[in-house]
Design a protein with these regions (language model features):
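Nucleotide-activated donor-binding/catalytic signature segment of Leloir-type glycosyltransferases, i.e.
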Residues: 20-38
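Short alpha-helical segment that forms part of, or immediately flanks, the ligand-binding pocket
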Residues: 44, 63-71, 85
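Conserved catalytic-core segment of nucleotide-activated headgroup transferases in glycan assembly
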Residues: 1-25
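A charged, aromatic-enriched C-terminal amphipathic alpha-helix characteristic of glycosyltransferases
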Residues: 98-101, 112-142
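Acidic donor-binding loop of glycosyltransferase active sites
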Residues: 48-61, 74
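Short glycine-rich donor-binding/catalytic loop of glycosyltransferases
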Residues: 58, 74, 78-88
Length: 142
């Protein structure tokens, strides 16, 4: 389980339905908070609060989650096999499911060197060809 490789990261796992017993068992770890049958207001708060979005859910995407994570400037990291909207994810943040330890290493490195998150977010925006306020100012010559 990826949470074991990243004890310094807190994981918020939300579902709009009930969670499987396997997923519920992850609640035993101190760095995991589970939100089964999550209310939209709680989900909105998580999108605003969290810095990372792990696109590792084997089921269908809910609430346009990857796009919302992108709009909330969250670093999106996921498994190639479960990606829901790869358009918003930089290639360097996509791992094979069997490479979960590599994904954990990359996240741990980002946590250890916070400047890396800014670089990774810049690559993510570039991958999605996103514009920010500075880009618009340059276009408008402001």
């Amino acid at each position: 389980m990826p949470v074991l490789f990243m004890p310094q990261m807190h994981f918020h796992v939300a579902a709009i339905t009930e969670m499987s017993s396997k997923l519920m068992s992850a609640g035993q770890y101190e760095n995991v908070s589970l939100y089964p049958n999550v209310k939209m207001s709680v989900l909105d708060g998580l999108f605003e609060k969290c810095d990372f979005y792990l696109d590792i859910n084997h089921e269908g995407e809910i609430v346009d989650a990857v796009h919302r994570a992108f709009l909330n400037n969250m670093l999106i990291v996921g498994y190639e096999e479960t990606m829901h909207n790869a358009y918003y994810t930089a290639d360097t943040n996509i791992f094979k499911e069997s490479e979960y330890a590599d994904m954990a290493d990359a996240l741990n490195m980002t946590l250890a060197m916070p400047y890396l998150i800014d670089e990774a977010l810049a690559m993510q925006k570039k991958a999605a060809v996103a514009a920010d306020a500075t880009d618009y100012r340059e276009i408008l010559h402001l």
